Amino acid sequence: MGALVVLALLALTGCTATGDRQMDDRDLAVLCSNDAEVCRAWAGAFTERTGYGVTTVRLPTSEALERIRHGEDLPEFDVWHGGGSEMYVEAADEGLLAPYRSAQAAGIPEDFRDPEDRWSGVYSSMLAFCVAPQAISDLGTDIPRTWDDLLDPALDGQISTASPRTSGTAYTAMSLQIDRLGEDAGREYLAGLYGQVLQFTRSGTAPAQVVARGETAVAITFAPYCEAARAAGSHVEVVLPEDATSYEIGAVAMLADAPHPGTAREYLDFALSADGQRAGAASGIDQIPTRSDLPGNLADVLADGRYPVIGASLAERSSRRDALLAWYTEEVER
């Protein structure tokens, strides 16, 4: 589907912050890799702040990267907002992102942004299980508390997760198993885990809704998506794995050859600011801020040791992605 058709459809379905007026030469096209409501909240807050319109196309992180790769000859988007920074590292290495040193970057620790200013981390979430306690009870088993608990035969066909080929969330979970167990044992574990999955979703935000609808008993997702489903009335609970977990650093970047670079820089200033990092919470999905001047920020969360976080460096997680996805395609999807 061509870009103009996609943008027109999104305007008809309300995934836009331009209202009824026509887009002008200051308006932005944003590729967004977060929950749809978060994307709308970000766009709406920027429009309210600046008066510029924002048209949003939402795609899972890995699909968004492929869209950017194939759009070099006819740039569609100004900004990419949301999704794990592993994919932003790849995009930066391929020359797909434009460097921009925002004054707001000073509020974000260096560990959470690119040293060459090609992307900045603006939120985070912890990897978790989203469980339906009644469904677990009906299966005659216990609520899973560790990764190995997900291999319980009672949970065969009762797990929802996204495909790591399309979802940054799912790739975070995949990479964690290699960190936890090593290359060979990690792949062996993943083969067993994926054998328990009812159906792979495209987006990492979707599995929590699969559990909320009663289609499975457990989802692998980031905690805020499960918390939002619970707040909306679903009988689900967040379980942080006791043996190990990981987290995402959700990023934002201006794309190389952005059609509206001036407005794109203003959008990055907003996204990195305290107001920008708080804006997503209006959607009901409360993610961890990266700014050190905001309460409950990522650096403080990691320092207090409340979660059993392990994991390789961002560069290492990014470098092994192609090999892991090739294994997944050959061993799981075939």
Question: Where are the model-predicted features located?
Answer:
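C-terminal motif of bacterial Sec signal peptides marking the signal peptidase cleavage site
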Residues: A11-G14
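Early extracytoplasmic/lumenal segment of secretory-pathway proteins
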Residues: T16-E90
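Extracytoplasmic ligand-binding site segments that recognize negatively charged/polar headgroups
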Residues: S33-R40, P75-E215
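A ligand-binding cleft/hinge motif common to bilobed small-molecule-binding domains
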Residues: E86-E90, A212, T216-H235, G284
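Periplasmic-binding protein-like
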Residues: S125, Y189-Y194, F200-T201, A232-A258, ...
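A bilobed periplasmic-binding-protein/Venus flytrap-type ligand-binding module shared by bacterial periplasmic
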Residues: C130-A135, S175, E248-T263, A279-G280
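An extracytoplasmic/periplasmic, membrane-proximal ligand-sensing/linker region
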Residues: D184-A185, T290-R334
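Mature extracytoplasmic/periplasmic domains
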Residues: L255-V309
